[in-house]
From Swiss-Prot:
One of its GO terms (biological process) is capsule polysaccharide biosynthetic process. The lineage of its organism: Bacteria, Bacillati, Bacillota, Bacilli, Bacillales. Keywords: Capsule biogenesis/degradation, Cell membrane, Exopolysaccharide synthesis, Membrane, Transmembrane, Transmembrane helix. This is Capsular polysaccharide biosynthesis protein CapF. InterPro entries: Poly_Biosynth_Transport, Polysacc_synth. Required for the biosynthesis of type 1 capsular polysaccharide. It is a multi-pass membrane protein. It is found in: Cell membrane. It comes from Staphylococcus aureus. Pathway: Capsule biogenesis; capsule polysaccharide biosynthesis. The gene is capF. The chain crosses the membrane at residues 7-27, 41-61, 74-94, 101-121, 129-149, 153-173, 198-218, 232-252, 279-299, 315-335, 351-371, 372-392. Belongs to the polysaccharide synthase family. GO terms for cellular component: plasma membrane.
């Protein structure tokens, strides 16, 4: 388990770093408006494609009923249908960012497909393979994005090369690994009945994931509508600490998921609770480190990395660092709940979070702008953490 943790730790640090550097490239070589366009596209697409991802990696780890081809066929079909509806919807609305939204949707589509091989690696505790696949995808994405964007200053063209990176890593790396190590030949299986079963099984988790992303996006949408893409760009750049932290915590929690599932099935309550405490401690430790760093070095780091206008808003980073502390601990408690197979709990917590986000977004953001958005996220995540703890204590 220690080796697996090390592989995933390195892979997720690399993944988070590459995503951060892509944002940094846009900030340094582009404009706050470009940052706003990119983040607006993420805000629009993330809830939709997180829902349609069906949280398939976690389901593969905890469910033995379906084959890899049934999983990937369901994911592919649902994502293509969703992409078509997104294109029609955005076109009808006449959104000027249609192209950016569609390209980001394509990235999400292929990332969802990659979740199937990731789930297979994880189920078999072959996290070295998962780490290599993630590493190749993220490094290739960063290199191609930097080259294209630095020469063209065309955001959409650079994003297209992220799509190419994702297709390459799946078609060449993942398919080869699955064939070599598991004798799995992926192909499309047109079984509508199975699609329906998988979709119904995963709805609670998928709904929870989509709500989680929507909860993150609502303050950004309100901010953009009231203050414009420039302000959204400033906030989204600073708030990227939450994206990176959440990505890191979600990925690391996947290392513990098979072990937690086994302990729960074997009714080893003491070991189950001990591992849960260890995970929550990791979340608290990382969260406290982010708070301390933002307090003492936040302004200097923001100014150095992004520019003076970002450093002047260090208070936003400090407030969001407390939010990150709550998010990380909540993610690990949520993983513990998923390991029990009680998928319906997570969407209840997401609904509670949505209610809080909506209230505070409309109370605080119009009056306090960036500060209001940061407070909205942090207060709501604290409520979510309390909710996770309440449901966790009712597991056994």
């Amino acid at each position: 388990m220690v080796k697996n943790f090390n592989y995933m730790f390195v892979a997720n640090i690399l993944s988070a770093l590459c995503k951060f550097l892509i944002l940094l490239v846009i900030v340094r070589l582009g404009t706050p408006e470009d940052v706003g366009r990119y983040n607006y596209a993420l805000v629009i697409t993330a809830p939709i494609f997180l829902f349609i991802s069906l949280k398939i990696r976690s389901v593969i780890v905890t469910n033995d009923k379906y084959s890899p081809n049934e999983y990937i066929s369901a994911i592919l079909s649902l994502n293509i249908i969703t992409l078509i509806f997104v294109a029609i919807f955005v076109y009808v609305l006449g959104n000027g960012d249609l192209t950016t939204i569609l390209i980001v949707s394509l990235i999400k589509l292929f990332e969802n497909i990659k979740e199937v091989p990731y789930g297979i690696y994880q189920k078999n505790e072959s996290l070295k393979l998962l780490g290599i696949s993630m590493g190749i995808y993220n490094i290739l994405s960063l290199i191609l994005f930097y080259i294209i964007y630095s020469f063209s200053h065309n955001l959409n063209m650079a994003l297209l090369f992220l799509v190419i990176s994702c297709i390459f890593s799946f078609a060449i790396i993942d398919r080869w690994y699955l064939s070599k190590y598991y004798n799995i030949k992926l192909h499309y299986n047109n079984n509508i009945a199975k699609f329906k079963e998988i979709f119904i099984l995963t709805i609670p988790l998928a709904f929870s994931s989509a709500l989680g992303s929507l909860n993150t996006g609502i303050p950004r949408i309100v901010l953009e509508n009231l203050f414009g893409k420039y302000t959204l760009g400033i906030f989204s750049t600073i708030a990227y600490v939450l994206v990176i932290g959440g990505l890191f915590a979600n990925s690391i929690s996947q290392v513990f998921l098979p072990k937690l599932r086994k302990l729960y099935k074997d009714e080893k309550k003491i070991e189950f609770e001990k591992l849960t405490r260890k995970m929550v401690f990791i979340g608290i430790f990382i969260g406290m480190c982010s708070v301390i760093l933002s307090l003492f070095l936040g302004e200097a780091l923001l100014s150095l990395l992004f520019g003076k206008e970002y450093g002047e808003n260090n208070i936003i980073l400090i407030i969001l660092s407390f939010g990150l502390l709550f998010i990380l601990s909540g993610i690990f408690l949520g993983t513990t709940i998923i390991a029990t197979g009680k998928y319906n709990v997570n969407y209840k917590i997401s609904l509670i979070l949505l209610f809080c986000i909506l209230i505070f977004s409309f109370l605080l953001i119009p009056k306090y702008s960036l500060l209001g958005a940061a407070l909205t996220i942090t207060i709501s995540q604290f409520v979510a953490l309390i909710s996770y703890y309440y449901f966790y204590k009712r597991i056994f």
